[in-house]
Amino acid sequence: MRKLLFLFCCSAIAFSLKAQQTKTYAERLGWPKGARVLILHVDDAGMSHESDEGVEKAITKGVSTSTSVMMPCPWVPEIVKFIKEHPNTDAGLHLTLTSEWDNYRWGPLSGRSTVPGLVDKQGALWPSVEAVYFHASADEVDKEIRAQLERALSMGFKPTHLDSHMGTLFARDDYMEKYLKLGVEKQIPVMFPGGEDLFYRAEAKAGTIAELKKQGKYKEGMDIPAPANLAKAKETGAMLWKNGLPVLDDLHNSSYDWNMPGVDQKSDAEIRKWYTDHYIESIGRLSPGLTMVIMHCTLPSANFKYICKEGNKRKGDLLAMTDPRLRAFLKKNGFILTTWREVMERRIKAGNSE
């Protein structure tokens, strides 16, 4: 009898531990089991006037719940003014280490002489993640992201979170270490998918397969490795949680790879339908947990084409976020919309609970 009781107790403990391990971060933050919680996040605020207009409209007229600001960019004062006039706006820092457009450039806030490895021959930040990877040290990256936070605070803008423009801070482990350290040190949430990452992994795998097929190298059933930056995702997520920060269960960052055929010849109604359909389909595939959905809502003017050629792609995001059909879909399917501000408040409330 005692042996049976002992075995029962051991089984109960094991079941309890397994249940804790399979809890989503959304559950640990107080949302019910099975909840699908979304941060609908607009990148690139401050990059241009058109970007700022897109952000403002997506948040005030649409379903978007959050944004992040590129502090080295020319239109930062405009978006910071909006944030201060609308204090409930959930706005973070889109930590920026690249300047990717040909005719519209910006440099580091920490000074070119302070971070020479971060600048190209024009004195601007490098145009690609690859160039940063091969030229910039982790110490230079650390100096620059801290300078960007310092500028925000000096403008009276206290960011609700940190994330990474073009994913540059995810390109090297030592960059990532500086990024995570800044968040923990300042107790500012960082964008990091530290859960099961089912959508992120599936989309990355599909992208790799598509590229291999294009190159004629794909063979049915071949092993497709997970993205390198997910190798220690769960371990890193646990570290962030232990240090008082919230963690994402998943990341939806595939919308920038969507290419509507002939988008520049389409009407707004056609663009809206195409993008809304894609958001409904992809969001519908998300598993329970806290997911950040990334987009680039923009209201392009006639001049925006001189910055980049993707104005209608970015407008597609805005048209989808303001489409009543998307709002109705989210409501009908029980999605919960949240912000980084609320997520951090819930993390503080959760305390040391596992």
Predicted regions and their residues:
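N-terminal pre-catalytic segment of deacetylase/amide-hydrolase enzymes
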Residues: 3, 9, 19-39
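Structural preference for beta-strand elements that scaffold enzyme active sites
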Residues: 37-39, 64-68, 88-94, 159-163, ...
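A short alpha/beta connector and helix-capping loop motif
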Residues: 49-73
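Catalytic domains of cell-wall/extracellular-matrix polysaccharide-remodeling enzymes
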Residues: 138-253, 260-261, 271-275, 284, ...
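Acidic (Asp/Glu)-rich catalytic clusters
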Residues: 28-30, 55-61, 78-90, 107-120, ...
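C-terminal domain-boundary segment and adjacent tail
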Residues: 190-192, 307-354
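Active-site gating loops and adjacent loop-to-helix segments of metal-dependent hydrolytic enzymes
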Residues: 106-131, 210-213
